[in-house]
Regions:
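N-terminal secretory signal peptides
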Residues: 1-12, 21-27
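Short low-complexity, flexible loop/linker segments enriched in glycine and/or proline
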Residues: 12, 80-87
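C-terminal segment of N-terminal export signals and the immediately downstream linker at the start
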Residues: 32-48, 78
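Short active-site oxyanion
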Residues: 42-43, 67, 98-100
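Conserved redox-active cysteine motifs that mediate thiol-disulfide chemistry
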Residues: 48-56
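Iron-sulfur (Fe-S) cluster-binding segments and ferredoxin-like electron-carrier domains
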Residues: 60-66
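Thiol-based oxidoreductase modules, predominantly thioredoxin-like and allied folds used
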Residues: 68-79, 88, 96
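Thiol/selenol-based redox catalytic cores and closely related redox-interacting motifs
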Residues: 84-165
Length: 165
């Protein structure tokens, strides 16, 4: 005959559930918020550990309402995994809203991308490191172009920046 005994692990299960709930609430309530009260969009930024301009770009993104999780990584495998063609690569790769952002793309272009959600593209890129792109900020200003790219490496012009933002 089996005696009625408390279920083993009940205390642990309740404790785990409570801690999970408290952790989730803290994470949600602790996130930076936009003026409308919505949580700031979060981006994952992969960067080479030795690159300083990448942090300047992260500062640009966070100053424009984004939350950034920065991961120092070997960039070759990251670019392969996210299908960034060699000709379109830059110093860091960012993931946000299902898109890949390659390099020093202005926050305003990312905002537009997330609003429009165009079909058939993987993301935006500024190949190389244009001197006047956010995070580089070399004076005098030098115009630069932001491109979309798809899985086959085809590009289209997304934005032309002819003056400082």
């Amino acid at each position: 005959m089996v005696q009625n005994q408390p279920l083993m692990g009940t205390h642990v299960d309740r404790r785990h559930a409570l801690l999970t709930l408290v952790g989730a609430a803290t994470a949600v309530l602790g996130l930076p918020r936009r003026a409308n009260g919505q949580p700031a969009p979060t981006m994952i930024v992969y960067k080479d550990p030795s690159c300083g301009c990448c942090q300047e770009w992260v500062n640009h993104a966070t100053a424009n309402g984004y939350r950034a999780m920065v991961i120092k990584a070997d960039m070759g495998p990251i670019k392969v995994k996210h299908q960034v063609p060699a000709s379109l690569q830059s110093c860091h790769t960012t993931l946000i809203g299902g898109f890949v952002i390659e390099g020093h793309v202005p926050a305003s272009d990312i905002k537009r991308l997330l609003k429009e959600k165009p079909k058939g593209i993987l993301g935006l890129t500024i190949p190389g490191m244009p001197a006047s792109a956010p995070g580089m900020d070399v004076k005098p200003f030098q115009p630069f172009t932001v491109l979309t790219f798809n899985a086959t490496g085809q590009t289209t012009v997304y934005a032309k920046h002819t003056k400082p933002a």
